Amino acid sequence: MGDAADPREVRRTFIVPAIKPFDHYDFSRAKIACNLAWLVAKAFGTETVPEELREPFYTDQYDQEHIKPPVVNLLLSAELYCRAGSLILKSDAAKPLLGHDAVIQALAHKGLYVTDQEKLVTERDLHKKPIQMSAHLAMIDTLMMAYTVEMVSIEKVIACAQQYSAFFQATDLPYDIEDAVMYWINKVNEHLKDIMEQEQKSKEHHTAEAPGGQKSPSKWFWKLVPARYRKEQTLLKQLPCIPLVENLLKDGTDGCALAALIHFYCPAVVRLEDICLKETMSLADSLYNLQLIQEFCQEYLNHCCHFSLEDMLYAASSIKSNYLVFMAELFWWFEVVKPSFVQPRVVRPQGAEPAKDMPSVPVLNAAKRNVLDSSSSSDFTSRYTRPQTHSSVSGGIRRSSSMSYVDGFIGTWPKEKRTSVHGVSFDISFDKEDNAQSSTPNRGIIRSVSNEGLNNSRASKHIRKNLSFKPVNGGEEESIEEELHVDPHGDLKSYMPLSTNELNSNENTHHKLPNGALQNRVLLDEFGNQIETPSIEEALQIIHDTEKPPHTARPDQIANGFFLHGQDLSLLNSNIKLSQSSPDNITDPKGALSPITDTTEVDTGIHVPSEDIPETMDEDSSLRDYTVSLDSDMDDASKFLQDYDIRASNPREALSPCPSTISTKSQPGSSASSSSGVKMTSFAEQKFRKLNHTDGKSSGSSSQKTTPEGSELNIPHMVSWAQIPEESGVAQGRDTTQLLASEMVHLRMRLEEKRRAIEAQKKKMEAAFTKQRQKMGRTAFLTVVKKKGDGISPLREEAAGAEDEKVYTDRAKEKESQKMDGQRSKSLADIKESMENPQGKWLKSPSTPVDPEKQWNLTSPSEETLNEGELLEYTKSIEKLNSSLHFLQQEMQRLSLQQEMLMQMREQQSWVISPPQPSPQKQIRDFKPRQAGLSSAAAPFSADSPRPTHPSPQSSTRKSASFSVKNQRTPRPNELKITPLNRTLTPPRSVDSLPRLRRFSPSQVPIQTRSFVCFGDDGEPQKEPKPKEEIKKEPSECKGTLESCDHNPGEKEVKPLESTVSEVLSQPITETVCVTPNEDQLNQPTDPPPKPVFPPTAPKNVNLIEVSLSDLKPPEKADVSVEKFDGESDKEQFDDDQKVCCGFFFKDDQKAENDMAVKRAALLEKRLRREKETQLRKQQLEAEMEHRKEETRRKTEEERQKKEDERARREFIRQEYMRRKQLKLMEDMDTVIKPRPQVAKQKKQRPKSIHRDHIESPKTPIKGPPVSSLSLASLNTGDTESVHSGKRTPRSESVEGFLSPSRCGSRNGEKDWENASTTSSVASGTEYTGPKLYKEPSAKSNKHIIQNALAHCCLAGKVNEGQKKKILEEMEKSDANNFLILFRDSGCQFRSLYTYCPETEEINKLTGIGPKSITKKMIEGLYKYNSDRKQFSHIPAKTLSASVDAITIHSHLWQTKRPVTPKKLLPTKA
């Protein structure tokens, strides 16, 4: 514990305080004390608590503790609740809380329900008198929970932990508040250990290297000692043991972890040397630490610790909520308020200043400092330090009144190599003309306004558990707006110094919300406008917009940043991306997406350039119209968000790593832009990481089990205070899991309903789409072919969607200069069509492959001339629809995955890729990442003509599918320029994720061989004329793209697929019609993904062949079954002959059929391999889930077993006590029957006590009246008056040791009469003695009680001596076992003594004044004598029994006689 010499040490030296032993510790009293102390402190403020309320208990004259009347009155009047509730629940000052009901209602609004033993507490319960304490405790507990949720949220904790922990295990992420608190303590303590390790190493290093370094006295000695001993010596200096906290209460009893935590935050106040950290802690050590903590809290934290030492030491489960609120307050002090003394410890290099001298920097800055330290990249500093300055200049984020956001500004930057649960989006400028504009450094980096979404992107373990952990203040949404967009134009500007042209939407949102732009389901469009996600219903209506690029970005924006899967997605995934690509990505170019991004690999890999977002978008993007209030649709929205987040981090569901734009290759995440010169992470590596990362990658189903299971995950621990009222009952912590069961079922049913609705909708739409496609196929295709010679590059259309292409083509002819704008905007006709046939266009269901071309040429020439205004309008509306659609698609993907898991029939599913993939370009984008490994890897790329490679269908399978949906954007200009690369366009097979790539069984679609449209140009690729700007941009972008392709060695496996498809359809299309069934799709029609966007120049050898896809029957049905993926049921398949689709292919005569066979084989092999991987991943996930469930089960069982053991132990102790008591009684009986005269001499007289069960029967004295005449009381009390007490004996130890239950009871406030009755019945047997030994005494005799009463109460004192003796003699003469004293009235004035026969219930007078006999009707009151107190107490009973010692009769019975009172009578006789 440090040197005693130090003054602080002197202060720390202490004597172990006296504490109550466990056996005497009253748990219920402790709970009441803790709750009241906390409530009073919150109601009045710690400093101003009224004196009489500081200690809620008082002790009465009988040593009984009671709650003080003032406290009781305040509780009954609700004043305390109203005061505290107004503070905690932030109630409107204009409408203060009045009364219990108001507080209960306010809590209910927060989703917290006051329950006492699963029963809702009502105002009546709280008004009851005498006070019903359990109801009040429940009320206080709920207020504490509200306060806890206000102070701490899972998101805040994770954000905080990111500062101190470089690596996250997704399985570790907390799933409720208690877990979050433990997670925080553990992460901080781990970080503290790391710091101490580093300091120790540097110290050793310093001493070893410093020539004239500090010379310890033993330095030379150690030089002489053999190395192995020296090593042991250093080991002895091992770091102190800071235990892991696994059970918040139990592991906190020694104070080690908590004291270490406090030391970390306040190293100058609580030094490590002051803390007792040992492997095995003694009781004294634990008390020392606990005292240290209490001192610290009293001195520095405003007395926030309302526990006694015993409370913290014994840690009863009843005070869990108190402990949580205490920890929440600590978190608030250390991470939010951060007073000057809070200076988190950092590594101090040898000789550096002590921590306490370092400037007080907010933790967030410290976190930033960590990042900076971890990478010396000046680039990072320029990017991140400056933005911070700027944002601070601009006023930083506005603090919302909600404490949830108190954690504030500059999101906590994850430390280097963090497995990003969150990613940071940043700019990687392309070498483009607007590079200069993208001055990234000016961008303000602002912490995510809401921490809500962080956990959503977390791994499946807790995937949705905390989804809706909504801060109790309920102000989530408003606060977000307040912080982020109080005025999209005003405040946003303050966050973003650059004008909107300079920043792409990415920057606006991502930079603003490093921890997750959407965390509260609030999206920002590219201009920072708030867009809230649409509900499912809205999305369903808008489904047709699926393929439209949600926003087309301005080319200039492209230079500034990337989007993951398009603007919407980028927003959605920003939660993940932000942290993901956090500084690490920037500072660690080579691994930008390396292991760091395990959880979010998917996103990381492919950031789609934002250029696709239309410049024309207003700040008032129509997406804004779809705002859904956070509170109103919490269930659905949170689910959506979560799904997004989860998917984003899910390799398969998340948007696949395949970028959707050609430039995907230069992923922002990978910092791949050619200009950046950063080494790109290969997709293969990412894939490998994904496979290894149990968390984010757990297969598609990993993060979302089938709907029911997903919801199960979601609910059990979702203490979502405000989400579902029913659940709020759970507010009291995880212990109330039973309440959640019904909620789980309820939610599961709702999800199931939703799923069915979506499925039905999906099927309808797919059917409609199929028809539409068939109709439009030929026309569209021919139109495209006709126009291909016009010189317009279809690429753009491909990316943006079929419609876009046509518009683009037409416009390109007319206005080359306006090409960019034209490309982004959609033609009116396309839009109309998309609206009329939403299904045909948007939800392209794979049911029938439609030639993308159909859609490309939907617009008529007249439409080409549409003016900008109209196009802009339509673009906006389509984008609006797209945002909704993306949500819906995401939901549908999730549901499909869940369905797959349920069906578990992977082999029977066939995949059909519907042509809807607007253009090969699109596919190319999607697959690029994958194929990058393919031909692109092989082919050298020139900066000018980068050829994006197609990922093989297999590699792209699932991922690309999801990607393509989100990433459909108008291709970038450079994309248009790409030279033909011979490649096969294989559409992604992950049908589920793409509405358009939906799974169909062969039956649904005539089994068609998957046809790959290969556009290849035998001759030199001709470049399409492009607008200058396009040309400028293209080289750099392409370069980036190519680089990324090169870096994806992993994808090279796909090489076999290389086809001669000129991805850049701008080349003449001399393609071989590869009617290649994809391995699995061997017999599946794959819509010719190639969008016939043809380069203006006509392909030299273009043979257009029309192939009836139905003719392409699978060689064997077996192939089809192989295709069936993830157990889609056969029923989904339609009859093979049902539909016949025609595909158009360009055939290259020079291609041999055997090439196709080889490709087919390669595809099949890859497919099988992927299937195996998927299965393996699923199995791993299932095993993990099973293991987790098993753990939970085991813990529950252990808890239950402990309780059982405890119960059994107590029962055993009780039984043992009863047994001993019985034995003792029997021994006493034996003694009575066979008295041993010698015993009396040895026996000590008992002190005052009525517990006769332990008294040996006294022996008859040699002189004086028979023993029976002795008053038992006098015998026991050693009263000097008693006949045989020669001297007053001290209270005998044996008596104290054998306190009978009755004695304990009376101490604890049991009713006196009960105690007395017990003792009298026991005592009668033991004390019976005298001449009549032949008669076995009755166990019910109260003779000795009556003797005691007469001697010490009724006839005490010298005055009554004569009367007393006479009556005692009468008693001895009587054979009766039971006697009754008759009182005059309730004043207990003695009148006479009666005998009572319990069997016959006769009461006859023995001596004194009164009726000869008394009947039941005459009795008015019954009394019991308490020997301890020497007084009678009234028994609230009507029936006379042997346990009664005295009675009164009705007063009218006395009035008739008026006898002289015994006191007058007897003394005269005497």
Curated annotation (Swiss-Prot):
GO CC annotation terms, alphabetical: centrosome; ciliary basal body; cytosol; Golgi apparatus; microtubule cytoskeleton; microtubule minus-end
Superkingdom field: Eukaryota
Quaternary structure and partners: Interacts with CAMSAP3. Interacts with KATNA1 and KATNB1; leading to regulate the length of CAMSAP2-decorated microtubule stretches. Interacts with a complex formed by AKAP9 and PDE4DIP; this interaction, which is PDE4DIP isoform-specific, recruits CAMSAP2 to the Golgi. Interacts with MAPRE1/EB1.
Function: Key microtubule-organizing protein that specifically binds the minus-end of non-centrosomal microtubules and regulates their dynamics and organization. Specifically recognizes growing microtubule minus-ends and autonomously decorates and stabilizes microtubule lattice formed by microtubule minus-end polymerization. Acts on free microtubule minus-ends that are not capped by microtubule-nucleating proteins or other factors and protects microtubule minus-ends from depolymerization. In addition, it also reduces the velocity of microtubule polymerization.
Name of the protein described by the UniProt record: Calmodulin-regulated spectrin-associated protein 2
Lineage, highest ranks first: Eukaryota, Metazoa, Chordata, Craniata, Vertebrata
Biased composition range(s): Pro residues: 1086-1098
Coiled-coil ranges (or none): 739-776, 870-909, 1147-1219
Record-listed Phosphoserine modification sites: 402, 404, 450, 581-582, 594, 656, 663, 845, 914, 919, 990, 1001, 1129, 1294, 1300, 1302
Residue ranges of domain CKK in the record: 1330-1464
GO MF annotation list: calmodulin binding; microtubule minus-end binding; spectrin binding
Comp. bias (Polar residues): 380-390, 952-971, 1001-1011, 1268-1280, 1315-1327
Organism (species): Rattus norvegicus (Rat)
Gene3D superfamilies on file: CKK domain
GO biological process, one term: cytoplasmic microtubule organization
Tissue: Present in the soma, axon, and dendritic shaft of hippocampal neurons (at protein level).
Biased composition (Basic and acidic residues): 686-696, 796-835, 1020-1037, 1044-1056, 1167-1233
Localization per Swiss-Prot or TrEMBL: Cytoplasm, Cytoskeleton; Golgi apparatus; Cytoplasm, Cytoskeleton, Cilium basal body; Cytoplasm
Segments for region (MBD region): 905-1016
Primary site of residence: cytoplasm
Biased composition (Low complexity): 663-682, 935-946
Region of interest called Disordered, as start-end residue ranges on this chain: 374-397, 580-622, 648-712, 796-864, 930-1059, 1078-1099, 1167-1327
Cysteine-cysteine disulfides: none
PANTHER family linked: CALMODULIN-REGULATED SPECTRIN-ASSOCIATED PROTEIN 2, PATRONIN
Record comment regarding domains: The CKK domain binds microtubules and specifically recognizes the minus-end of microtubules. The MBD (microtubule-binding domain) region can recognize some features of the microtubule lattice, which might contribute to the specific decoration of growing microtubule minus-ends by CAMSAP2.
Keywords linked to the UniProt accession: Cell projection, Coiled coil, Cytoplasm, Cytoskeleton, Golgi apparatus, Microtubule, Phosphoprotein
Domain Calponin-homology (CH): start-end pairs: 222-335
